[in-house]
Every structure is written in structure tokens, then in C-alpha cells.
Amino acid sequence: MIRDAVLRGEVAEAARVLARLGLVTAFGHVSARAGESMLITPAADLAGVTAASVIEVPLAARVLPAGVPAEAWAHLALYRARPDAAAIARAQPTAAFAVAAAATVMVPVHGQAAWLGESVPVYGDAALLRSTDRAERAASCLPAGEALLLRGNGALTLGAAPGMAVARMWLLAAACDVYLAARAASGANPVTTLSDDEIASWRAVGGELLPRLWEHLRSGPGSAGPRPGEEQGQGQPGDHRRPPGPRVMPLDLREEREPHRGAPDREET
């Protein structure tokens, strides 16, 4: 029971941070695995979520409880498909929409992006993940790695804890910005992506450095209210000022296949 209460607090705090970072508007959710169930934020503005408003859903659920986001099926599908997934964030970074419309996969072009996976796949169906079948099809695109771009529908990130999933969502937004900027700056020249060895070296230190990123995000200006264990009853969320989300350059990018790592990528002609 104590662990469950702490985990509810972690989910709620992560949700409020996600809102404060400007990565969600009226839509988005955070969840955590809790044994044979998951704890997920309600279908509500994440800026006001508290531990008491987090909802428990069995992983084997065939019907969603009242108040649960309709795309909770995506969380359930990922928990079933990925036993290593302990927490999930669902958001709509602006740059993620741009990359998912322009590419079929995003390979890291800077080191921290490797903490999202050896590459970030794009699920190509823009329909909402409001059914088991659609959610399972999306989950099948992420057999490994920690981030999935959803064409026309935002993104999903995984983590060892709710805060780690949110840190990866922030990092995914930043990685998409860098990717788009690199494509714009390169002009007619191909973009050089990280090699397999470079990706492996960055992934090797992710467990050490990603928690530092989460601490930075949770402690930033307008920090999101009480931390887990500090909430009393419904609690009073803190200052939820939301900075502008990541900017996106308008680019005319064609769909690409996965580039060769460690060498400039080449679009098919």
C-alpha cells in the first residue's frame, strides 16, 4: 500500500512536469506499471493531476474504467509487449509531428538522442489508438528502444519510472528539433548520424545521466507542486506556468528510409 501511494505520487508529479514543460495541451497522459495493473492519469488537464486522481487499471482489462483516457489502450499494449517497461508518457511535442510527417525513422544525430533508442521508429497510422487492435499495432513497432513517434498523433516514451518517461519525452522533443535543424542546415548535403559504436557509448551512460535530466526538469522554474510523499488529500498543485513548446522550422522534407549510421544519410531518388 505504501509503495502504491508513492507510485501514485510519482505519476502525478511526472504529469504536472510534463504539462509545465509545454509538451501537452488538453491531451496527454502518464502511467506506471504496478504489479498486474497500471496507474494512469485521468482524462483531464495534467497540470492539475494529484495522486488521488490517478486511476488503477488491470493490465488484462477488456473495458476501460470511467475517467481513463481513451488511448489508455496504448499503455496497456506496451506493458503487455514490453515487460521491461515500467512507466510511459504520452504527449504531443510540436517537432515530433514534423519529423513523423517527414521520415519513417529518426536515427540520432547527437549523443543524448541515443537515450531514446538506437533509432526512433515512426508508426505510420495517424488514427487515434482507441482500440486494442490499433494500440497493439503501434506497440509492435517498438520491440526495443524507448521512444515511438506517432504520425499525426504525437509520441510515446518509456522509462524505469514516471519521471524517466517524462525526461525522455522532453529529450524526444529536443532531439526532433535538432534533427530538423540539421536537415535544414545541411541543405543539399546529407546529414551525418551517429555510428553504432557512438550510439552504444551514449546508451551505456544513460542510466547514470538520465536521472540528472529528470532532476533538472522537475526542479525548474514553476516547479510542479508537492513531490511524492508530500501530498495531503487532493493536494494543491504548484505554479503551472507553461513555457512555449519546442519551435519547428517549416521544412519541405521528403519521407526517408533509415540512413546508414556513422555516414551521411542519402535519400532515395
Report the location of each language-model feature:
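Intrinsically disordered, low-complexity, charge-rich segments with an acidic bias
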Residues: 228-244, 254-269
